[in-house]
Curated annotation (Swiss-Prot):
Source taxon at top rank: Eukaryota
Gene3D superfamilies found in the cross-reference section: NAD(P)-binding Rossmann-like Domain (3.40.50.720)
Function according to Swiss-Prot or TrEMBL: Could be involved in a ubiquitin-related process important for DNA damage tolerance.
Transmembrane segments: none
Pfam families: ThiF (PF00899)
GO molecular function: ubiquitin-like modifier activating enzyme activity
Protein's name in the database: DNA damage tolerance protein RHC31
InterPro entries named in the record: ThiF/MoeB/HesA, ThiF_NAD_FAD-bd, Ubiquitin-activating_enz
Keyword line: DNA damage, Isopeptide bond, Phosphoprotein, Ubl conjugation
Disulfide linkage: none
Keyword GTP-binding among UniProt keywords: no
Residues found modified as Phosphoserine: S9
């Protein structure tokens, strides 16, 4: 991700004063220069759009070739009942622009399948929501080829997931030095500390701060769906406490890849989840029958409160990496709307 950073105007500095105080002038300028593509303006896509538009992103292109339906009205706040039957981007463009007239917005209703490599080359980051899994893998293959970071998010009623592929990302964090100083070296299979520098507090020389540079490596979606495991990454006690949502989400994604368009039965879902439990190294008992039933019933349903949580999490991480702040998420999140757990797994 190599952006040409533009300086902020005095008006922009005044407009974004509060968030500049939070994450700094450089981070805000980075966001002002970023070009982001958002695919599908559903419930999650609407939440992400709202957050990054208000944050002061420079350029946002929304690609959505869907019409507004009555089913959209309960979960998508940019549209109303008067918009049913219209192109979604035609119905929402003025409302989105009103959030922040300063940003450059582009709307595109062309079918995703018609977009070629040249189209994607213009962006610094891609966010894809509510995708068929084969489409997501195809886009991920392309974004990797072009070295473009990618977020993929989807929901099924009370349950949701986020996949992140930043390919390779160097993050910098600063923290107060503890009794045991941070050292260079691997901290997980996907992350390594590559540099640690220190500075003294200007007001208290007894305090030392560490600036930690971390190399984050990511894996493509098709590889995650083929080889994801938690073996040797967690203790036996931790493996027994893994949420049902993880094997069920992976099962649903894998089933969508292999059996596109076909309804999934309880028996099939249970068998697939058991296979994933074995692959992950977790006991099959973590998958509960009532969760399987809920997963099947809620497949493909958008629920506004879940979209708000997932959209907010994705938008925050997008802002972090565009602003080159803090360590990014790495690399697979699931959300359980029943327990409100949202664990992060590193595959």
């Amino acid at each position: 991700m190599d952006m040409k950073v533009e300086k902020l105007s005095e008006d922009e500095i005044a407009l974004y004063d509060r968030q500049i105080r939070l994450w700094g002038m450089t981070a805000q300028a980075n966001m002002r220069s970023a070009k982001v593509l958002l695919i599908n303006l559903g419930a999650i896509g609407s939440e992400i759009t709202k957050s990054i538009v208000l944050s002061g992103i420079g350029h946002l292109t929304i690609l959505d070739g869907h019409m507004v339906t009555e089913e959209d009205l309960g979960s998508q706040f940019f549209i109303g009942s008067e918009d049913v039957g219209q192109w979604k981007i035609d119905a929402t463009k003025e409302r989105i622009q009103d959030l922040n007239p300063r940003i450059e917005l582009n709307f595109d209703k062309q079918d995703l399948q018609e977009k070629d490599e040249e189209f994607f080359q213009q962006f610094d980051l891609v966010v894809a929501t509510e995708m068929q899994i084969d489409e997501a893998i195809k886009i991920n293959t392309l974004t990797r080829k072009l070295n473009i970071p990618l977020y993929v998010a989807g929901s099924n009623g009370l349950f949701a997931y986020v996949f992140i592929d930043l390919i390779e990302f160097i993050s910098e964090d600063e923290k107060l030095q503890s009794v045991r100083p941070t050292t260079v070296g691997p901290i997980s299979s996907n992350r390594s500390i590559i540099e640690v520098t220190t500075r003294k507090d200007e007001e208290d020389e007894k305090k030392t701060y560490e600036r930690i540079k971390t190399k984050n490596c990511y894996r493509p979606l098709n590889e995650v769906l083929s080889t994801a495991t938690l073996k040797e990454k967690m203790t036996q006690r931790q493996l027994k406490r893994v949420t049902s949502i993880l094997p069920l989400t992976l099962s649903l994604l894998q089933y969508g890849l292999n059996q596109k368009g076909k309804a999934i039965s309880f028996e099939q879902m249970k068998r697939d989840a058991a296979v994933w439990c074995e692959n992950l190294g977790v006991p099959a008992t973590v998958v509960k029958d009532d969760y399987i039933q809920q997963f099947i019933k809620q497949k493909g349903i958008e629920f506004a409160p879940v979209a708000a949580i997932i959209g907010g999490a994705v938008a925050q991480d997008v802002i972090n990496i565009l602003g080159k702040r803090l360590s990014p998420l790495n690399n697979f999140i699931v959300f359980d709307g029943i327990t409100l757990d949202m664990p992060l797994f590193e595959f």
